[in-house]
Amino acid sequence: MRWLPLLLIFLLAYIEISIFIKVAAVLGVAVTLLLVVFSSCVGISLVRNQGMKTFVQMQQKLAAGESPAAEMVKSVSLVLAGFLLLIPGFFTDFLGLLLLLPPVQKSLTLKLMPHLSVYRPGGWTGGDAANGNTFDGEF
């Protein structure tokens, strides 16, 4: 179990290199490198645009007194998508673009919502002070 993260990193590197070699064999190395750079740029601009929309929606929910938990899950998926799109390679770009799709974000939201709770500072309510008894003391 301790070796699982390291194994996943090596597996990801193997998949990325294999796909890169196959694409480069078909399209050529220069075109393949341009595709990797282009997909990263397009992905980052998509994440930036969707991130601003999500931020505005989160502010609107907070202003209306509603829970922004769904927007929080969406923002986490956007951050993860942005990270995956920054990693050079076609497989991680595919995973990052997959996380940008609204149906995938909705299914992630439905799976993660039961595990989220939004904390709002509101002070204490109730307790012994509510019945009028006050105790003075020194520390």
Curated annotation (Swiss-Prot):
Q: Which parts pass through the membrane?
A: 17-37, 78-98
Cross-referenced InterPro entries, in alphabetical order?
A: FxsA
Q: Which family does it belong to?
A: Belongs to the UPF0716 (FxsA) family.
Look up keyword Transmembrane and say if it applies.
Answer: yes
Recorded protein name is UPF0716 protein FxsA
Membrane among keywords: yes
Q: Which organism is it from?
A: Serratia marcescens
Q: Name one GO cellular component term.
A: plasma membrane
UniProt entry keywords in alphabetical sequence: Cell inner membrane, Cell membrane, Membrane, Transmembrane, Transmembrane helix
Database matches in Pfam families: FxsA
List localization entries. Answer: Cell inner membrane
At the highest ranks, the source species' classification is:
Bacteria, Pseudomonadati, Pseudomonadota, Gammaproteobacteria, Enterobacterales
